[in-house]
């Protein structure tokens, strides 16, 4: 499964091939932000749920990518033949996401999404990874799951899974770049300029994001 921030970095590197990148994965948001603060890393991509006053001094953030959320179903699901669904249509349907870990950014995001639209997002059950989840969704007429539009997933052809757009409004997952304001690494400045030029210039009522994500729309260093 490929992540949207990884895709952003690949596009950045194609545009700036002489810029050296050392990419690491840090699961925990607090650990990643602490690593930025101590200069262990220069920046991190996160969905920033905390207000600025609760971030370490000198830490800044800017929302750089809004990733639309899609519905993934099997061929026997009620919505399998649709091209798009609305959040209102999903009320009463079980959306299974056993990979959600409590106290993480994506847990906060999907809790907010469920509360905003009255959705039944179920994180119970053992999480055996992506492949077993896809296999279960493929064989179920009732279960569906959410995936990011830019999240690359490969499955066997016989699963016949369907990716449906969610509209009116479209939930978007807000990825932000987090960095330290006094970090003068030249590649960091180049990356920030690139992301600022590439990010969407307008967000309107056709999309939805949690209230905490709005804090980072115009924040920059």
Say what each PLM segment does:
Residues 1-34, 45-46:
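N-terminal winged-helix
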Residues 4-11, 52, 93-117, 206-209:
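Secondary-structure junction motif
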Residues 12, 36, 71, 89-90, ...:
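Residue-level signal for nonpolar/aromatic packing positions in well-ordered secondary structure
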Residues 14-18, 150-159, 168-221:
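C-terminal effector-binding regulatory domain of bacterial HTH transcription factors
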Residues 59-69, 73-95:
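Flexible hinge/capping segments at coil-to-helix
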Residues 29-37, 48-62, 79-80:
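Ligand-binding clamshell of periplasmic/extracellular solute-binding protein-like
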Residues 28-33, 37-41, 99-162:
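Hydrophobic hinge/microswitch elements
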């Amino acid at each position: 499964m490929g992540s949207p921030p990884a895709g952003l970095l690949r596009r950045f590197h194609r545009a700036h091939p002489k810029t050296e990148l050392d990419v690491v994965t840090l699961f925990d948001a607090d650990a990643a932000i602490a690593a930025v603060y101590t200069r262990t890393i220069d920046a991190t991509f996160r969905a920033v749920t905390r207000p600025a006053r609760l971030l370490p001094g000198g830490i800044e953030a800017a929302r750089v990518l809004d990733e639309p959320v899609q519905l993934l179903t099997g061929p026997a699901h009620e919505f399998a033949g649709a091209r798009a669904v609305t959040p209102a249509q999903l009320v009463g349907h079980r959306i299974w996401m056993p990979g959600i870990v409590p106290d993480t950014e994506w847990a906060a995001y999907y809790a907010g999404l469920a509360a905003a639209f009255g959705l039944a997002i179920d994180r119970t059950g053992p999480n055996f990874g992506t492949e077993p989840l896809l296999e279960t969704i493929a064989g179920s007429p009732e279960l569906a799951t959410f995936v990011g539009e830019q999240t690359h997933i490969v499955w066997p052809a016989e699963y016949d899974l369907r990716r449906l757009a969610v509209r009116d409004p479209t939930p978007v997952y807000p990825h932000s770049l987090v960095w330290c304001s006094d970090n003068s690494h030249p590649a960091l400045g180049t990356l920030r300029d690139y992301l600022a030029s590439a990010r969407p210039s307008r967000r309107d009522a056709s999309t939805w994001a949690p209230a905490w994500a709005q804090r980072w729309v115009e924040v920059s260093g």
